[in-house]
Amino acid sequence: YVGSFLIWQQPHFIYLAELVYRANPSDEVIKKYNRLVQETAEFMYAFATYDEFHGRFILKGAIPAQETLRAATTINPPFELSYWHFAMQTAQKWRERAGEKRNLEWDEMIDKLSPLAYNEDHLYLASEDAVDTYKDIRFTSDHMAVLGSVGILPMNKLIRDDYMKNTLHWVWDNWNWGKTWGWDYPMTAMNATRLGEPEKAVGALLMDKRTNTYLQNGHNYQDGRLRCYLPGNGGLLTAVALMCAGWDGCQVKNPGFPQDGTWDVRWEGLKPMP
């Protein structure tokens, strides 16, 4: 029953609508999608719980993208926190584009959303309750979703750049890479790109692991049971686009590739990511 408890797909509509608007910033796009953007944000606001004792909003009762965690005990998974922050801010932008006032309750949640939890080594946890993240292999297998908090998504105030770099380095050296999926490699590449580590970005895409295999027909092979895995293909295309075109505010040309003259990168028609 994993799928029933996943919440990380909920903001997808807002993210995709934002990409459509950025490709065609018009009233037509706003009229077509704004109602669904707002209704998605209404659910996201209602799903979050206000922790009165600590004066913060938390996410709980869900299985995170790293599916080895349990819904009954998981509090504040990092990727979901970051995605909530991004999507709620984006929904507010859509209100303004549509000539509507910002929702003050949503602004309060954006302001009081819990920061990502970390341990004494300044490594981000798989979730706030997973204090043994770096001791229990259950937490260091499957998707390293903590890296998606910055990479798939832009940096935000819930995250410290230095702690996220610490986390990337630990994952790179110690993760149970034999228990990963095809989109984990582009997710790692996007994280490394945003953190200014292009060598690791390229290295992640070229990592010699079974689930990072692409067959001659282009399919991302996982195993004999799962010979085509489209999330890997989508992740690869997204990662390369970010590595080439960058993101809002990025000043580095081709930020996902080493800047030492060894790469001649050519591309066209790509747009920066949020």
Please annotate each region the language model reported:
Residues 32-39:
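A non-catalytic, amphipathic alpha-helix used as a structural packing/dimerization or gating element
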Residues 245-257:
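Bacterial peptidoglycan biogenesis and beta-lactam-recognition machinery
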Residues 1-23, 31, 78-248:
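Active-site core of glycosidic bond-cleaving carbohydrate-active enzymes
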Residues 4, 49-50, 138-141, 270-273:
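A general structural signal for short secondary-structure junctions and capping/turn motifs
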Residues 254-274:
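Surface beta-strand/loop "capping" patches
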Residues 39-97:
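Acidic/histidine-rich catalytic neighborhood
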